[in-house]
Amino acid sequence: DKKKIVFVDGEDTNMFVEDRVKDGVVYFKRELYPDQKQIHLQEYMQHVLPISFAFPTAKVNKGQKKERRVAHSDPRDKKTYVFEKEYEYYHDYKYSKYAFTMPKAGWDCLRHYEIMGNGCIPLFPDIMNSPRYVMMRFPKALLTKVAFFDKNDPKWLDQNYEYFQAEVMDHMKKYNTTKALAEHVMKELSLINK
């Protein structure tokens, strides 16, 4: 019974596993945006749904008293990747107000969620260009505002940091933890299987 099969495609590309799409099974796709090479699959898309990374619920940390404006780790400069242990990497975010992030192999990457999960606000300069069905439960509108003010009025952004951090953390807990993702997937499956 196809209703009992769920396929989760976590690949960093937007290409589909054609046989699974054509099988008609429920297909969760992380990098879900059109590719003209697979336009012939359009008729099979009724069971394809977006999915994203999530941060472990037990590891969510509001952060500490902020010691610096921007985290040392910066994906735009590989020389800043100096941490060998997860706790060192997370410590950098916990004590920073903001941290830069960007697409990695695909638009969705765990780094975005690690930043938020450690009480830090992602600075994602190109977030407004992300495809519509990628990172559907990510706070894109909120982080578009943050990116705008970081570029045009960083002093105002810093004066309103507590507000934006609270908004990011509220969103994170509601939509971007592993528990929230599991609940969302189960809800989607219950709607499809009616």
Residue spans for each PLM region:
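Nucleotide-sugar donor-binding catalytic core of glycosyltransferases
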Residues: 1-166, 170-193
